[in-house]
A protein has these predicted regions:
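N-terminal cap/lid segment of alpha/beta-hydrolase-fold proteins
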Residues: 50-88, 515-521, 584, 588
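Cap/lid segment of the alpha/beta-hydrolase catalytic domain
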Residues: 86-181, 229, 365-376, 506-508, ...
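Glycine-rich nucleophile elbow surrounding the catalytic serine of serine-hydrolase chemistry
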Residues: 193-203
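Active-site-adjacent alpha-helix of alpha/beta-hydrolase-fold enzymes
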Residues: 120, 333-352
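Alpha/beta-hydrolase fold nucleophile elbow
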Residues: 183-195
Length: 669
């Protein structure tokens, strides 16, 4: 049977066909309209809402910012940020020269007010804002916005730098430009800074510009081999490798050091030697790293750029305020070495000043009421900035300012938590109108049999030595693991490690621990302790770490967490191969007792009654310092896995082989 469609259905189909035709026509029309729109001239597009160049309205700001490029004598231009208080007139200039980004250091907050934009590294904000100073921060050549080539701690013109420019000439040229081009200034300039930025004020003292009236080097880099950033007595500070990589890898520090482990202890152990780790990171592309590999010993390359040695040969023309942190985890050597070098030139006792505070590296610019768990009963950082730094700067930089009431040495005394006004350093107590009422006596604190510590020398018949096994496969960590990398990011505690509780180390079998009886009277030390260690090793090279420690009572009222705390007061490391000469390493004679005598960092401390004194001896401080293979090799940077061997270490304490730490004990006259 054939299918048929009713008439009504035919009508319905015709209707829908007509409707579809209408839709198709409408669609075609829309398509034509869109196509026409796409061929519309560009001038009719929706315009950008971003201005070609935004002009911020800053009438309400209480400061003016100027970014300039200052020409140096060789034609290179250095990026410089100038911050002026609004309405400034006849104002002095505070200059900082930095490799750490001048823009960032003057842009800490998006604020209309001067204090927030400066709150941070290098900026003593209270001094700058309350004192009405013009703040100038400059990128050193080769970094961030500045032209030229970057060289780490660029040496002075001479054997190590054949060019006509250095930090001394760049500072001179910068100051010359500033006083001629900032009409709001009074023509007087002070220079200050921390760490690397503390090194540049020292350079400014070489042939200083006449307008430079005062310098404040804080925690400065001075001698990278003896005891600042790169080595301590020949032991390489390998945790600094990341800094070198980032600082010299690019102009703006954008390429970051990478790691494959959470614990830095594992990072450096897995690689083996520092040289091998550097190779794995491509660090040999970096010029400063290649120089370190070539100069592991204290040769002319190091000696000729040591700032204490350089300044010892320079005339003293500019007043200097050296700032030292007693627990400086980076540059604990520098400020004190410069003070010792230039103070003899200060015949009037009015040009070289010293501040010693209870701080980590650069903490004087921050809250100084505590360091880690150690409390100081007041904000020592604020005291420094308001009572010492500001009046000191005002005296030399402000027209008509009064003389600052600042003693030649302002030293915080840890233990008692008091500031001491001293005539010089070391000095046990303030001078009277006629003479000092105390003296400092080098007093041996002896290691004795039975792991005892005493001011009494060893006795005949007692055990002549103690020993331990030092295993490079299990080096003593310098702090409790997991060990963080160096740095100051939120959550990082790198700045606190020198005040870490040493109980973790004192419980190890490869650390010798000598402890005194409980003190009945206070023992005050002011100056540099000297390690006098008679020791032997079964190997042919060895590191020796000596730590002077204040042991708190078992219970501390009000601070239960400090019960039994072992607080380092002074500590350092010495690489045995340099026992006879810092310039020429020599293998040690295995098994032979030898004398190792080396200085520890300055201390100004009182061991209180109820406390005990402690000395710890060990042969590794890893991974802050690279491992000694304990087998003599020409260059430890390239020690092979088979070079790292266990060694039996002996520390002697017989009458004819006495080991002791010589303490600068303050005695009443």
């Amino acid at each position: 049977m054939q299918n048929t469609i009713p008439v009504s259905e035919v009508s319905r189909i015709r209707f829908f066909r007509s409707l579809i035709a209408i839709w198709l026509l409408m669609g075609a029309s829309l398509f034509v309209q869109r196509a026409a729109a796409q061929t519309t001239p560009a001038g009719s597009t929706l315009p950008s809402e971003t201005p070609a160049r935004l002009q911020p309205v800053i009438d309400s700001f209480d400061y003016e910012r100027r970014d300039v490029m200052i020409p140096m004598r060789d034609g290179v231009k250095l990026h410089t940020v100038i911050i002026l208080p609004k309405g400034a007139k006849g104002a002095p200039i505070l200059l900082t020269r930095t490799p750490y980004d001048a823009t960032a250091q003057t842009s800490h907050a998006p604020s209309a007010h001067l204090a927030p934009i400066l709150q941070g590294y290098d900026n003593a904000t209270e001094v700058i804002v309350e004192g009405g100073y013009i703040r100038v921060v400059q990128d050193v050549r080769g970094k961030y916005g500045s032209e030229g080539d970057y060289v780490m701690n660029r040496p002075l013109h001479g054997p190590l730098n054949p060019t006509p420019v250095d930090h001394a000439t760049d500072t001179y040229d910068t100051i010359d430009w500033l006083v001629k081009n900032i009409p709001e200034s009074n023509g007087k300039v002070g220079i200050l800074g921390i760490s690397y930025d503390g090194f540049t004020p020292l350079m400014a003292l070489v042939n200083p510009h006449p307008a430079l009236k005062v310098a404040v080097p804080m925690n400065p880099m001075v001698d990278g081999w003896m005891g600042d950033d790169w080595f301590h007595n020949g032991a390489f500070r390998e945790q600094n490798m990341g800094y070198i990589y980032e600082q010299e890898g690019t102009r703006d520090n954008k390429i970051k050091w990478w790691t494959s482990h959470f614990d830095d202890y594992d990072v450096y152990m897995e690689a083996g030697s520092a040289g091998e780790l550097g190779k794995r990171h491509g660090l040999e592309q970096v010029g400063f790293w290649r120089k370190l590999l070539e100069h592991p010993s204290y040769d002319a390359w190091w000696q000729q750029q040591a700032m204490d040695k350089i300044l010892a040969d320079q005339p003293l023309k500019v007043p200097v305020l050296l700032v030292h942190s007693l627990w400086d985890q980076e540059d604990i050597y520098g400020a004190m070495a410069v003070y010792k070098a230039i103070k003899p030139k200060d015949t009037g006792n009015d040009k070289v000043f010293l501040v010693m505070g209870p701080w980590h590296h650069g903490q004087e610019i921050d809250d100084g009421s505590s360091l880690g768990v150690v409390k100081f009963d007041s904000d020592t950082g604020l005291y420094f900035r308001r009572e010492i730094l500001r009046p000191f700067l005002d005296q030399y930089l402000k027209d008509g300012a009064p003389k600052a009431d600042v003693a030649p040495v302002m030293a915080f005394e840890t233990g008692t938590n008091n500031w001491r006004r001293l005539g010089s350093w070391p000095s046990g107590c303030p001078p009277t109108s006629t003479s000092s009422n105390c003296t400092i006596r080098a007093t041996p604190l002896y290691l004795n049999a039975g792991l005892k510590l005493s001011f009494e020398s060893p006795k005949s018949g007692d055990a002549p030595f103690d020993e331990y096994v030092s295993d490079p496969a299990k080096p003593v960590p310098y702090r409790v693991r997991p060990i963080q990398p160096m740095g100051y990011d939120t959550g990082m505690t790198w700045s606190e490690w020198l005040v870490d509780d040493q109980r973790e180390q004192s419980g190890r079998g490869d650390v010798l621990v000598y402890e005194s009886e409980t003190l009945r009277t206070p023992v005050k030390i002011s100056g540099q302790p000297m390690a006098n260690l008679v020791a032997s090793t079964s190997g042919t090279d060895s590191d020796w770490v000596v730590k002077v420690i204040d042991v708190y009572p078992d219970e501390v009222a009000g601070q239960p967490g400090m019960g039994g705390y072992q607080l380092m007061i002074s500590a350092d490391i010495f690489r045995g191969r340099y026992r006879e000469s810092l310039e020429t390493p020599k293998a040690l004679e295995a098994g032979k007792p030898l004398l190792y005598r080396f200085a520890l960092p300055n201390a100004n401390h009182v061991f209180l009654p109820g406390h005990r004194m402690m000395v710890q001896i060990q042969s590794a401080w890893f991974p802050l310092y690279d491992r000694n293979p304990q087998t003599f090799v020409p260059n430890i940077f390239w020690a092979k896995p088979e070079d790292y061997r266990k060694a039996v270490q002996r520390v002697y304490h017989a009458p004819d082989r006495a080991s002791f730490v010589e303490l600068p004990v303050v005695m009443a006259k």
